[in-house]
Curated annotation (Swiss-Prot):
Its EC number is 4.2.1.20. It catalyses: (1S,2R)-1-C-(indol-3-yl)glycerol 3-phosphate + L-serine = D-glyceraldehyde 3-phosphate + L-tryptophan + H2O. PANTHER family: TRYPTOPHAN SYNTHASE ALPHA CHAIN, CHLOROPLASTIC, TRYPTOPHAN SYNTHASE, ALPHA CHAIN. This is Tryptophan synthase alpha chain. NCBIfam families: trpA. Coiled coil: none annotated. Pfam families: Trp_syntA. It comes from Christiangramia forsetii (strain DSM 17595 / CGMCC 1.15422 / KT0803) (Gramella forsetii). InterPro entries: Aldolase_TIM, RibuloseP-bd_barrel, Trp_synthase_alpha_AS, Trp_synthase_suA.
Length: 256
């Protein structure tokens, strides 16, 4: 069984942390992954930096720009991940835009993911129809779970279709804005979470965008299996460096 599916069966609320590969320094990728697992994170999303990250807010955009300046590329990320499965056991997901994957070669990319122990992909600009028609068989051949995003504007019909072609979890975006721009969840967002819950999907949902602390983590996981934090974690690194990523995780999970 894929590590993502195994993790989703665990009887607790899940925390996923996103960070940008090659940030703040080129060599930080492996250290951050290892430290996050030690601190009790359930999933890790490794951001593949891209020059035009449309869905990302300013914090993640800046980290992506810096990572590219540091020399991070798709090939170099796979080099860094070569021995990672000797050091960590939790699910690892690469999150990135489709252009670098196309440039690398989609099948070559999937093959490298399998070789390095990547469990899934989140590709915000890969439409579900295109995935279903052209890439689903290929991704599944290499054991990869492709995670799709839904927003408050996604219709019930579309959500059901996404659910039908998914075999991991559904990324439930808390708003239609960019990452890192929300503070707490209003009535409209809660109504959207409830609407998705009422659809009784086969794939669990994990909430992303606007999760930054224990309060927002708890709010999100009232309606979902887990929550994803990106911008707030990168801000923590900006302010505190990479020497104590565990302190951030402990605050979110309210561990003492």
């Amino acid at each position: 069984m894929n590590r993502i599916n195994q993790k989703l069966q665990e009887d607790h609320k899940l925390l996923s942390i996103y960070f940008t590969a090659g940030y703040p320094d080129f060599e930080d990728t492996e250290k951050i992954i290892v430290d996050l697992e030690k601190s009790g994170v359930d999933f890790i999303e490794i951001g593949l930096p891209f020059s035009d990250p449309l869905a990302d807010g300013p914090t993640i955009q800046k980290s992506s720009t810096k990572a590219l300046k540091n020399g991070m590329t798709t090939s170099k990320l796979f080099e860094q991940l070569k021995g990672i499965r000797n050091k960590v056991e939790i699910p690892l997901i690469i999150m990135g835009y489709f252009n670098p994957i196309l440039q690398y070669g989609v099948e070559d990319f999937c093959k490298k993911c399998q070789e390095t122990g990547i469990d899934g992909l989140i590709i915000p600009d890969l439409p579900v129809d295109v995935y279903h028609e052209k890439y689903q068989e290929l991704f599944e051949q290499y054991g990869l779970r492709n995670i799709f995003l839904i927003t408050p504007q996604t219709s019930d019909e579309r959500i059901h279709f996404i659910d039908s072609v998914s075999n991991g979890f559904i990324y439930m975006v808390s708003s239609a804005s960019v990452t890192g721009s929300t503070s707490g969840f209003g009535e409209d967002t809660r109504a959207y979470f409830k609407r998705v819950n009422d659809l009784q999907l086969k794939n669990p949902q994990i909430v992303g965008f606007g999760i930054k602390d224990n309060e927002t983590f708890n709010q999100a996981t009232e309606y979902a299996k887990g929550a994803i934090i990106g911008s707030a974690f990168i801000k923590h690194i900006n302010e505190n460096g990479t020497s104590n990523v565990g302190s951030f995780v402990k605050k979110v999970k309210a561990l003492t």
